[in-house]
């Protein structure tokens, strides 16, 4: 079964173009299922003998370990994807996980930052032209700050370009870090994005993102010029050593700027994607067009964003209408 799991992980990574987190999570979930199928000192139950009753026993086993419903639901989703892959590769004839219902989860509608909040945050991002004091360090009991190195002074230009692009295009973080130079049509301000399932879409970006990118290109050239070894000459967003930036690094960078802003904003890359869709919807954009821009396979996925918009409209109505 281990070889099948390795092939499944390769399928997620290279065919589904899944994010590193999804690959790690789903791989871990399936390995946990393999552990469940293997009694102490015994042999693993063959996949061909796994039916929906075994899947239900696994779900009960997860609950016995005090796992939350949302975690159980994700592991069940991983098994559905795994067995779908197994059917395709003819390791099994059916998908037993498809016959087991997902635990009912509370429908939580996330708060989406207003356009004003996002604009204030973006306007407050450093441009990277001036040297900045870096976090304090203690030496001999004294707190001291240090000046940023020449390369560190330039990193805010990269960071601003990334964050502007996340909001301008509604990108997934995996799509952002996967961008290559060939993804851009600079003259037309269009971006070719490789999304989930290796599906390609074209997304426009606006003037502010364009300005941020134009400020970043010389920084990128400098990183490549000073890099040791063989840098990634195709990747758009680079770390200081010339390698492709990771999605984990993007999350850290965004969190850092939220802390520097001193506001109550708790932004994640997906927060900007959600805000992108909600703000377009609030300004009258067609839901089908938003679906295309986000790269959603199903309109029902895009419709989740309407729930937040309706709640915001109701709040305005309740506050403003004399008979509310």
Label each residue range with its predicted role.
Residues 1-324:
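Conserved catalytic core of the tyrosine transesterase superfamily
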């Amino acid at each position: 079964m281990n070889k099948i799991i390795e092939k499944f992980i390769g399928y997620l990574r290279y065919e589904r173009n899944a994010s590193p987190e999804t690959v790690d999570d789903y791989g871990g979930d399936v390995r946990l299922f393999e552990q469940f199928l293997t009694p102490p000192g015994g042999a693993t139950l063959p996949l061909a003998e796994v039916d929906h009753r075994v899947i239900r026993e696994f779900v009960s086993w997860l609950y016995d370990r005090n796992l939350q419903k949302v975690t159980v639901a994700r592991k069940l989703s991983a098994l559905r994807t795994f067995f779908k892959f197994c059917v395709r590769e003819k390791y099994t004839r059916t998908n037993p996980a498809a016959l087991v219902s997902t635990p009912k989860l509370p429908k939580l509608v996330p708060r989406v930052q207003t356009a004003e909040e996002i604009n204030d945050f973006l306007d407050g991002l450093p441009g990277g032209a001036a040297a900045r004091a870096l976090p304090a360090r203690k030496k001999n009991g004294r707190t001291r700050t240090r000046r940023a190195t020449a390369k560190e002074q330039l990193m805010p230009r990269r960071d601003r370009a990334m964050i502007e692009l996340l909001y301008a295009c509604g990108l997934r973080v995996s799509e952002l870090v996967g961008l290559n130079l060939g993804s851009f049509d600079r003259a037309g301000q269009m971006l070719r994005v490789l999304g989930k399932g290796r599906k390609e879409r074209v997304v426009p970006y606006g003037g502010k993102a364009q300005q941020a990118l134009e400020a970043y290109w010389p920084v990128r050239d400098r990183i490549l010029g000073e890099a040791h070894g063989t840098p990634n000459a195709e990747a758009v967003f680079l770390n200081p050593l010339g390698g492709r930036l990771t999605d984990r690094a993007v999350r850290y960078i965004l969190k850092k700027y939220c802390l520097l802003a001193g506001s109550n904003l708790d932004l994640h890359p997906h927060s900007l994607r959600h805000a992108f869709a909600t703000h377009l919807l609030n300004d009258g954009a067609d839901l089908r067009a938003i679906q295309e821009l986000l790269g959603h396979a199903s309109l029902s996925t895009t419709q989740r964003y309407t729930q937040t918009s309706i709640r915001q409209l109701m709040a305005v109505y309740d506050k403003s209408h004399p008979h509310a």
